[in-house]
Amino acid sequence: MTVEKSYYMTQEGKDKLEEELHYLKTDRRQEVVERIKVARDFGDLSENSEYDAAKDEQAFVEQRITQVEKMIRNAVIIENDNDNPNIVSLGKSVSFVELPDGDEETYTIVGSAEADPFEGKISNDSPMATSLLGKEIGEEVTVTTPGGDIDVRITNVE
């Protein structure tokens, strides 16, 4: 028996996945079925690009449903029960400045399933997060990234 991977996420992240799953199973799946029906009406399926595209889309939707179901089934909800509010931990937002005189940036550290850097959510597996986890406000940390080392100072944790 294979042990399935755990997916660390906030309750908000799990709720979004459940909404996506509902949408995929109801609306999206039905839309694809309708596209397949319409494409069949075009005739010969051996040279029907609309039919092929609709079948490819159906495979993608079904694969995504399977993936989201697995993530929900194996979700581990991140709880902010850390006694020290100044320590960076999973589920918290951390602000830092790049040294010597960079701008302040803020990210929330979440599980990989929920990560979205464009929304300010970084994976707990990322170089930045692994360097910051367990550190406190005021600490200076060297983050090793593919682009080189970056020195930062933690300015806030919430």
Swiss-Prot record:
Coiled coil location: 47-75
Q: A Pfam family name for this chain?
A: GreA_GreB_N
Q: What is this protein called?
A: Transcription elongation factor GreA
Q: State if Transcription regulation is listed as a keyword.
A: yes
Q: Which family does it belong to?
A: Belongs to the GreA/GreB family.
Q: Which GO terms describe its biological process?
A: DNA-templated transcription elongation; regulation of DNA-templated transcription elongation
Role according to the record: Necessary for efficient RNA polymerase transcription elongation past template-encoded arresting sites. The arresting sites in DNA have the property of trapping a certain fraction of elongating RNA polymerases that pass through, resulting in locked ternary complexes. Cleavage of the nascent transcript by cleavage factors such as GreA or GreB allows the resumption of elongation from the new 3'terminus. GreA releases sequences of 2 to 3 nucleotides.
Q: Which UniProt keywords apply?
A: Coiled coil, DNA-binding, Transcription, Transcription regulation
Transmembrane segment boundaries: none
Q: What NCBIfam families does the database record attribute to this sequence?
A: greA, PRK00226.1-4
Would I find DNA-binding among this entry's keywords? yes
Q: Which GO terms describe its molecular function?
A: DNA binding; RNA polymerase binding
